[in-house]
Amino acid sequence: GNVLAFRILPGVDVLEQRWGAARKIFEENPQLNIIGVEFVGYDSFKANTVVSDYLAKFGTIDAVWMDAGGTAVTILEAFKDAGAPYPKVMVGEDQQDYLAYWKENNLTAIAPTFPTFQWRTAVLSAVMFLEGETVQRNWYLPQPDVTAENLDQYENPEMPPLHYALCGCEDMTNYPDAWKTPDINKYVDVP
């Protein structure tokens, strides 16, 4: 089937690792026809245009692979806008807007994760170091896949669209209320 691959940015470690794994799988499966590999940044307009252009050129897109899911909903909406069927297989990430769209439209999809809670690891290890504690050499952090079987566990309609299900913030003060309605006015530039 026709596979359209979306990349966000070149040179980002986790995205290059994902692309390397995908490329290997694509090369080992000649029945997969990779019709394009497109860098779109997080530009929704560009992602929509790419889908429209490839649908016009190839007629069908059977699967969409993404190295990051920031434009997943836009990509799916581009299929809908074109009157084309959704891809038979869709790869996105654990953003709430994508998980909700997946659930609402009963897609065949998956959401590999690179949990945003990993940012905490560097901060925690720095605090441990500064307090004279031993910092472990290796950190093993879970990276579960969101699948149809566990989608309900991660999709949370109370959270904002760009909220990552694997935020690692569940045990933080004021979660989830502070995440539902963030006060963006408290973040101001200090002269």
Can you describe what each PLM-predicted range is?
Residues 1, 62, 108-109:
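Conserved acidic residues
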Residues 6, 119-191:
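Hinge/cleft segment of the Venus flytrap/periplasmic-binding protein
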Residues 13-23:
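Short, surface-exposed alpha-helical segments at coil->helix boundaries
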Residues 21-22, 36, 40-101:
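Hydrophobic alpha-helical
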